[in-house]
A protein has these predicted regions:
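Flavin-dependent oxidoreductases
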Residues: 1-69
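Structural motif
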Residues: 10, 37, 112, 139-141
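Short, well-ordered loop/turn and helix-capping segments at boundaries between secondary-structure elements
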Residues: 17, 45, 119, 163, ...
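Short glycine-/acidic-enriched loop or helix-start segments at secondary-structure transitions
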Residues: 22-24, 81, 152-153
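Short, hydrophobic/amphipathic alpha-helical packing segments
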Residues: 34, 95-99, 151, 155
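Active-site lid/adjacent beta-loop-alpha segment flanking the redox-cofactor pocket in flavoenzymes
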Residues: 45-139
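C-terminal lid/capping helical subdomain adjacent to the catalytic/cofactor pocket in oxidative enzymes
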Residues: 134-184
Length: 184
C-alpha cells in the first residue's frame, strides 16, 4: 500500500503477530510466534470423536469434517526457532516433531500428510489480548496479542477496542493501560 494514500478519521490495527512491523509501540507487548500444523489425507473413519490437547496445550489434534487428522503445535520443543519470528513457512524440525507425535499417539493413522503449514500468532507479554489506542495517536486503535486464541477472543476484544477508540471507554481486563504508565 505504499503506492496509495489512505485518509480516515479513525484507524484500527488488527495486526496481531505482525504488530511490531507496523508500530514500534508493540515492541515489548506482542511477541510474534510461529504456529505449525499438518493434516492427513482423508481417512476411512474418524480417528477421534473430539479435539484434544496434550503437553500442557503445546500439542493439539482434531478430526476434520472430512475425516482427516489435524495435528499442530510442538513449538515448545523448538523455542529458539518458533518464538520472536515472522517467518511463516513450516520448519522441518517442528514438522518432524508433529510426525513423531502422530506416530506415537495415533499409530493406526498411516495416511499420507496432505498439507503442512505455518502461521504467525501474536503472544502478549501477559497472555491476555490487548485493546486500546496508541498513546501518541488517539485515533489509532488496536486489538492484538491473542496468544493463540484469536478465534475465541477476537470478536470480544475487537468490540472493546472499537469502544475505546470511538468513546474512550476502558476495555477492562484487556485494556492497554496495564502496560502503559498513566499520568494524571
Amino acid at each position: 500500500t505504499r503506492q496509495f494514500i489512505f485518509r480516515a478519521r479513525y484507524v484500527m490495527l488488527c495486526t496481531n503477530g505482525y504488530s511490531l512491523l507496523v508500530e514500534p509501540f508493540f515492541k515489548d507487548k506482542v511477541i510474534p510466534t510461529r504456529g505449525q500444523v499438518m493434516v492427513t489425507e482423508p481417512l476411512a473413519e474418524r480417528p477421534m470423536p473430539t479435539c484434544g490437547y496434550s503437553h500442557y496445550g503445546y500439542m493439539y489434534y482434531r478430526s476434520t469434517f472430512d475425516n482427516r487428522l489435524l495435528i499442530g503445535g510442538a513449538r515448545h520443543l523448538h523455542k529458539a526457532s518458533e518464538n520472536d519470528t515472522t517467518e511463516d513457512r513450516p520448519n522441518h524440525a517442528v514438522q518432524g516433531s508433529l510426525d513423531d507425535y502422530r506416530a506415537r499417539f495415533f499409530p493406526d493413522v498411516t495416511a499420507p500428510v496432505a498439507r503442512r503449514w505455518a502461521g504467525i500468532m501474536g503472544f502478549s507479554a501477559d497472555g491476555l489480548p490487548i485493546a486500546g489506542t496508541l498513546p501518541d495517536k488517539p485515533r489509532v486503535g488496536f486489538a492484538v496479542g491473542f496468544t493463540g486464541h484469536g478465534l475465541s477472543l477476537g470478536a470480544g476484544t475487537a468490540k472493546r477496542a472499537v469502544e475505546r477508540l470511538l468513546n474512550g471507554t476502558h476495555a477492562g481486563a484487556v485494556d492497554v493501560d496495564r502496560f502503559v504508565a498513566v499520568v494524571d
